[in-house]
Amino acid sequence: MEFSTKALDWSKAGQNGFLATKTDCLVVGVFEGQNLAGVAKALDVATKGLVARLLKQGDFEGKRGTQLTLHEVAGVGAARVLLVGLGKEADFNDKAFAEAVRTAVRALSSTRATSALWCLSQQPPQQRDIGWAVITTISLVRDAGYRLLERHPGLKRANGKPGAADKATLRKVVLAVDANDAKAATQAVVRGTAIANGMELTRDLGNLPSNICTPTYLANTARAIAKRHKLKVEVLGRKQIEALNMGSFLAVTKGSVEPPQFIVLRYDGAGAKQAPVVLVGKGITFDTGGISLKPGEGMDEMKYDMCGAASVLGTLQAVAEMGLKLNVIAVVPTCENMPSGVATKPGDVVTSMSGQTIEILNTDAEGRLILCDALTYVERFKPAAVVDVATLTGACIIALGHINTGLYARSDMLADQLLQAGRKSMDTAWRMPLDDEYQDQLKSNFADMANIGGRPAGSVTAACFLARFTEKYDWAHLDIAGTAWKSGAAKGATGRPVPLLTQFLMDRAA
């Protein structure tokens, strides 16, 4: 899908003005009530009071979530005019803006329109600028148009014919902006497109079946990103992982015939003296639970257990496309967690790269076992900050559901930066406790720590486990178990937390 901007003179609406633009659909936002303003007023004047009459007659009221499509409107060059309800102007916030975009996309999807002049983005909520509006619009429109089957021909249905849901008709969107916002809007198109691309990569990797998206596939994806954007990439195999004494990571890999991979992808957008931000993503490409086997029902969704890895790769790709002036490193430990005659058993004790010993009481608590060695490895980069991303605990879903990502951090400053980025990108997180008292639950009679701490505060104790390996740098942990994918009729990867991470990095680069 192609996005561009067009600077328009709103004072010249009719003949030779923006309303004369030839396009399949003109998209205009209308606030609830009869006091028209902005583009809606210009449209009303050019159409001799059409919008006002519709409001007065009650055919369209401008309420949130509503829309009305008009065809062949006199005085308008577009084949269709789509009126989108914005709700009450006093209540127009980020969520109302997003709802208007989604409403417009749904309405357009029921037509054969392939192009649109989009007059919603120049009307952002208070305290938001044109850049935010453009990035948000592109992300939401692209999100609605995502189709895995079209992006991966090898997954097409046997008859070779896509279903109705696989058809995306909207191909070109021109975002109308004020002339004095043109420069900022153009930059925002680049950034919005990069973020959408990163989200789509993340969703692709998550949605692909685990017989395709293996650890080797993830490594090859990282190599492809590096080649396309001229980045540095290093992929360590089993022998190199063994040489680094990553005993915790290796313990998880023992049951699978798929070779483990340890991926390091570097984006150097600033000088060598700038300490990098490191993103660490959990890459379990399929999680059976190992010897502590999961129930069969719903196990197919454990292909999503690598969404942390997918999100950091998607984020790094987005950063490279945007050309941000900062240094970012993505680190991905990736393997399968499988049962077999040589798999790690409950009660086994292993030595991590840090030298700390771990009693593995439950082989299904494997994400923390691969992450802890990665978190030790990244000390060599002397990072400015480290953020790990993982579908780590079902307990986080119990605590927060599917709305907020769980956020853990020692530093209030780092936590606030991530929370603010989440609010701005509408990819929200909620800060969880990391008190030292929870560490007592990880005590072991046979090792420095156990890999589980019992049922109480399961997401917290998982974060406390990771905290033991992050004392040499500023660190945060994002538990995305509830936000990385959806189940049911809308089943599929969400692309989160790419918007949060990219906004966090854009803010640091500003």
Curated annotation (Swiss-Prot):
The keyword Membrane does not apply. Keywords: Aminopeptidase, Cytoplasm, Hydrolase, Manganese, Metal-binding, Protease. It is found in: Cytoplasm. Signal peptide: none annotated. InterPro entries: Leucine_aapep/pepB (IPR011356), Macro_dom-like (IPR043472), Peptidase_M17_C (IPR000819), Peptidase_M17_leu_NH2_pept (IPR023042), Peptidase_M17_N (IPR008283). Its EC number is 3.4.11.1, 3.4.11.10. GO terms for molecular function: manganese ion binding; metalloaminopeptidase activity. This is Probable cytosol aminopeptidase. The active site is at 294, 368. GO terms for biological process: proteolysis. Belongs to the peptidase M17 family. Gene3D superfamilies: Leucine Aminopeptidase, subunit E, domain 1, Zn peptidases. Binds 2 manganese ions per subunit. Its main location: cytoplasm. Presumably involved in the processing and regular turnover of intracellular proteins. Catalyzes the removal of unsubstituted N-terminal amino acids from various peptides. GO terms for cellular component: cytoplasm. It catalyses: Release of an N-terminal amino acid, Xaa-|-Yaa-, in which Xaa is preferably Leu, but may be other amino acids including Pro although not Arg or Lys, and Yaa may be Pro. Amino acid amides and methyl esters are also readily hydrolyzed, but rates on arylamides are exceedingly low; Release of an N-terminal amino acid, preferentially leucine, but not glutamic or aspartic acids. It comes from Cupriavidus pinatubonensis (strain JMP 134 / LMG 1197) (Cupriavidus necator (strain JMP 134)). The gene is pepA.
